[in-house]
Amino acid sequence: MPTYIALLKWTAKGIAAVKGSPARLDAGRQAFKQAGIELKEAYLTMGRYDLVCLIDAPDDETFATGILTLGSQGNVSTESLKAFSEDQYRKIVGSIKDDSSNL
């Protein structure tokens, strides 16, 4: 199953109700689960983003639907990254031909 990294920032609405964010996280995890998406990890972060989440979804379309639904609630804005495992990374890099002019 593909892995995605979601970078979240609280909106003005979200930060005003920050004490309710753990309950919203639980509800979001359950809604994702019902959609076939697994919220594997959620981290409170210091810096540019307020939360970083590791998410598995069956495909890009399912993930996009879930993350857009999350954003539409107005508590967070999101930026998403598709992630590749270390094994996938090694396979991708290993497939690079020595002569890059032969793409």
List where the protein language model places each region:
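A compositional/biophysical signature of low hydrophobicity enriched in polar/charged and small residues
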Residues: 1-103
